[in-house]
Amino acid sequence: MNTTIKKYYKTFLIIIFLTICCFLFYIYENKFRQNNKSHTTSEPIVLNLLTSVHPSLSWSFKPVKSKIIVNPGEVTSIEYMVENLSNKATSGIATFSYYPKQFGSFISKLNCFCYDAQTLKPKQKDIYSIVLLIDPEVTKDSKTKNIKEVTIQFIFFDYKKFKDNKI
């Protein structure tokens, strides 16, 4: 083989090799990555945050943000502003509910002010938080996979009256 033919042959092999590499990269990007993305990510869920305080407790209680967007599988912290409006120290306890109900088994409260009674001094203001995790399986369950918006509600009650079943 003469030198010119060897050069053309090497050039041809390099072009074939680069073409195959580009083709494999294209297949990887357009097939493997798209399929992988559709299985590992999910659409965010909107949480509408509602609060109320039973008339037996003279507190103000509001979410810092009334609506937040969360991604299933990510730990989320939600903050609430609370204030004792009375001139005496008072204790309250919160109950937690959500709608739609079938979503509840997919919410894990990792830390919550609602686990214990909370006491505020007269006119004291504070920030309470809840740390929660929405199980990514929520996007795969037939009863919940189409839910894109959830309402979470906390109601604060006077702790003593709540404990004594007087509410």
Where are the regions that the model predicts?
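Mid-length scaffold segments of soluble, non-membrane domains
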Residues: S66-F106
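Buried hydrophobic-core signal for structured, non-transmembrane domains
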Residues: E79-V82, I130, I152-F154
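Terminal connector regions
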Residues: A89-F106, L110-F113, P136-I167
